[in-house]
């Protein structure tokens, strides 16, 4: 009777599901089955207050078998590379709808391996740029078209609400945030020392 299953690698990933799960629990009679590989996942505390949220812990060694034997209507994950490495689609049910939830608003082509979303049926996109990228990659790689659903990025909405709810504090001394990318020739590799010396 596990119609809807979410899988989380650890407690840090709940934030990507939070808004969706809360909406489902508040507006439907669907039970959310939440599988986590973190025995200390926050979901165990949340489930104490929410009877339709059913958390389960599964260790890494049993995860592969669980995924191969998955029997659900819908499986939602933030883990890219379904089918590409150790996590496979169910061998038991071929009609499961697998949904990928993005970790951020950036370019999926820059942040994920080639083919990382190819074996998902549906991808929740944060905006039209991700939709365009995915469609272009499907065309270039001749892969099946996925259902693309523009859902925004609720985590950013929550951060904005939290910021706007606080009193504005103006620092007398300006603060500079340096946020390098992961790409080759990023600011840390190319000019960090010169930048710091000038400050």
Give residue spans per PLM region.
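Non-catalytic membrane-proximal stalk/linker segments that position and tether the catalytic domains
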Residues: 1-2
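Conserved catalytic-core segment of nucleotide-activated headgroup transferases in glycan assembly
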Residues: 13-29, 154-199
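Active-site and donor-binding regions of nucleotide-sugar-utilizing enzymes
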Residues: 5-161
């Amino acid at each position: 009777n596990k119609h809807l299953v979410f899988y989380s690698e650890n407690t840090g990933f709940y934030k990507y599901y939070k808004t969706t799960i809360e909406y489902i629990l508040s507006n439907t009679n669907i039970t959310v089955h939440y599988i986590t590989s973190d025995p200390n996942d926050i979901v165990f505390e949340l489930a104490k207050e929410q009877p339709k949220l059913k958390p389960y812990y599964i260790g890494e060694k049993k995860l592969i078998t669980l995924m191969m034997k998955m029997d659900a209507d819908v499986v939602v994950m933030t883990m890219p590379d379904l089918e590409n490495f150790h996590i496979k689609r169910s061998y038991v049910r071929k009609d499961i709808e697998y949904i990928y939830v993005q970790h951020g608003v950036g370019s999926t082509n820059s942040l994920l391996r080639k083919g990382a979303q190819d074996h998902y049926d549906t991808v929740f996109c944060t905006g039209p740029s991700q939709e365009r990228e995915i469609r272009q990659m499907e065309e270039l790689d001749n892969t099946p078209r996925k259902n693309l659903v523009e859902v925004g990025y609720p985590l950013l909405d929550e951060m904005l609400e939290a910021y706007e709810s606080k009193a504005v504090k103006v620092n007398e001394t300006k603060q500079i945030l340096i946020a390098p990318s992961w790409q080759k020739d990023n600011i840390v590799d190319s000019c960090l020392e010169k930048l710091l010396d000038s400050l």
